[in-house]
Amino acid sequence: MKVLNAVRGGFAAALLLALVSALPGTAHAASLEVKIGNFTFGPQKITVKVGDTVTWINEDDIPHTIVSTGKFRSKALDTEDKYSFTFTTAGTYEYFCGLHPHMQGSIVVETATGSAATQ
């Protein structure tokens, strides 16, 4: 009888854990990467969800920065340096390299329902 009760208790705990894991809002935020190389950002445009983190990685042999006027600004990134930013507000974020302004990119941040607000 004790064994049967232990099995029932284990089954109930596993079922409860499965149900809680399936609830909305338990999804984990994503991490995405943008590579910097040959004076370009790649990919140049990405779409993420609110709460996602984007990490820029400088694979070039010269320094670069990531600047979104009024939103975020990295220090000068040497080769293999990284800069991460977590997006908490939906919208479109245009950015560029402060040292080489012709290098440009954009991040579209959508809400969980898939819409992007205007920044």
Predicted regions and their residues:
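Extracytoplasmic copper-binding redox domains, predominantly the cupredoxin/blue-copper superfamily
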Residues: 2-10, 18-119
